[in-house]
Amino acid sequence: MMMRAVIRRAASNGSSPSLFAKSLQSSRVAASSPSLLSGSETGAYLHRGNHAHSFHNLALPAGNSGISRSASLVSSTLQRWVRPFSAETGDTVEAVVPHMGESITDGTLATFLKKPGERVQADEAIAQIETDKVTIDIASPASGVIQEFLVNEGDTVEPGTKVAIISKSEDTASQVTPSQKIPETTDTKPSPPAEDKQKPRVESAPVAEKPKAPSSPPPPKQSAKEPQLPPKERERRVPMTRLRKRVATRLKDSQNTFALLTTFNEVDMTNLMKLRSQYKDAFYEKHGVKLGLMSGFIKAAVSALQHQPVVNAVIDGDDIIYRDYVDISIAVGTSKGLVVPVIRGADKMNFAEIEKTINSLAKKANEGTISIDEMAGGSFTVSNGGVYGSLISTPIINPPQSAILGMHSIVSRPMVVGGSVVPRPMMYVALTYDHRLIDGREAVYFLRRVKDVVEDPQRLLLDI
């Protein structure tokens, strides 16, 4: 039926059957030539689902200008359809969000490290994701040119989310970019007259409201708010980072869940500081790391936890879980927020191993390269606010732990020693604990053990 209609239309245009046959034959040749669809060898196929449709049967008379325009329209349409299909055959690859750890389900796309059109190498970072704990890089799966980003900065993404399309060859990228720009130019052309038509309508509405503006109520309201305007102009509103949100949530949950109580004591740092100054050079020559005060407090905390195992325990529902291991978390303040890496097996480490672990974890935390596994777990936390000059504080428990030890600055104060008043380097220490699980007696005994070990480190050698 369609063939008869075409023959009748050709006859009505004054062309003979022989002429139509020639035009039909020429149109078939034109349809099979590469000029109709660049990039195809024998013809264009459009894949939809599991079916392939050939366009060789679009025979168009060469003498008809209207049909020629239709042919060009079909050609341009097929070109746009084939490009995404060719991308699926291996011309492009997709960069996706990697696995971020068992305890992290999503993150925020913090920033793009590359721009569309830039060339990237395989495994080169193109974007960064900020999670509750660490910052993770999204790497390019192959070398090529970034065609486009599929998400925006600030979007919440999950593992497997497609972030960018990367073209393996520059030719494919150059073919896609013009097709993406065409709809932008066509969309922008009709918009100006529409805006021009809407402008007089928008202007007409305020004209009617203008006489109502200079009424008596507005002036007193503005005069009342005038003193508040200058402070607002000096304010800055910055969205919270994922890490800051997570820290805020966990600390508030800790405050709402635990029965927090803090007990204090003071420690004479004379002997520990003397030990450090006496052996710091030999310690560095042998172990390649400086001897600090933190390792002495870690060893003292381990000894106190072994004497008071309930401080190392945790409440789980109606049960108490006693941990037979000691994993010490250390609070590290960074420019992005507070992170708490873990010294695993601290009860089996010596001073050198503890110092090396602390330096390594602190360096990774400040550089933002610390992994999630290095911050997971922990049975007890030690926080040193003394490095910032804190004299005394009440630290908050890091859940799901039950206690935290707070160190503070060393201050020379007059103390009575042997009946005489002498200056001594003193430090206040604080233990915040969950009073649901830990009684005051255990908390005081814990701090007394820390005090005894720090003031007389030889107790560790004799195990007394």
From Swiss-Prot:
The keyword Acyltransferase applies. Residues 1-85 form a transit peptide. GO terms for cellular component: cytosol; mitochondrion; oxoglutarate dehydrogenase complex. The 2-oxoglutarate dehydrogenase complex catalyzes the overall conversion of 2-oxoglutarate to succinyl-CoA and CO(2). It contains multiple copies of three enzymatic components: 2-oxoglutarate dehydrogenase (E1), dihydrolipoamide succinyltransferase (E2) and lipoamide dehydrogenase (E3). Residues 167-243 are annotated as: Disordered. It comes from Arabidopsis thaliana (Mouse-ear cress). This is Dihydrolipoyllysine-residue succinyltransferase component of 2-oxoglutarate dehydrogenase complex 2, mitochondrial. Forms a 24-polypeptide structural core with octahedral symmetry. Residues 172-189 have a biased composition (Polar residues). It catalyses: N(6)-[(R)-dihydrolipoyl]-L-lysyl-[protein] + succinyl-CoA = N(6)-[(R)-S(8)-succinyldihydrolipoyl]-L-lysyl-[protein] + CoA. Pathway: Amino-acid degradation; L-lysine degradation via saccharopine pathway; glutaryl-CoA from L-lysine: step 6/6. It holds the Pfam family 2-oxoacid_dh. The lineage of its organism: Eukaryota, Viridiplantae, Streptophyta, Embryophyta, Tracheophyta. The modification N6-lipoyllysine is found at residue 133. Keywords: Acyltransferase, Lipoyl, Mitochondrion, Transferase, Transit peptide, Tricarboxylic acid cycle. GO terms for biological process: L-lysine catabolic process to acetyl-CoA via saccharopine; tricarboxylic acid cycle. It comes from the Eukaryota. It is found in: Mitochondrion. The active site is at 435, 439. Binds 1 lipoyl cofactor covalently.
